[in-house]
Amino acid sequence: NPAVGWLIPQPWVIDADGDRVRFDDIVGGHWTVLHTGTDAAAGAWRSAGVPVLRIAGPGSAPGADRIVDRDGTLLRWLEDKKTSVIALRPDGFVYAGGTPQRPLPPPPAGFTAQANRVKDHA
């Protein structure tokens, strides 16, 4: 997948509470799966304790499992990388990616996210 190995951008996003925050304030330091639509292939990651978040476009409503890409930076980046779902490492680099035609690979055998949750920045 063309996104693998790249450092993801750090734009402003809208969190579940409707606050404008840096993307890293939400996912920084934790494994996270991000997707642009369906997260069907992310089930194995979720079972391993990894949060799964949808990236919604500008003007969308935020939610518990959805962040809003304020200016479309993340969505454009994913489109440029020809991917719709990624597994993001704690350091912000893309570990794995997928598309509807090539689903996101599962985590490595035995992988479990330790005390992994999206940051509570309230």
Each model region followed by its residue ranges:
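Helical substrate-recognition/capping region of FAD-dependent monooxygenase/halogenase enzymes
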Residues: 1-122
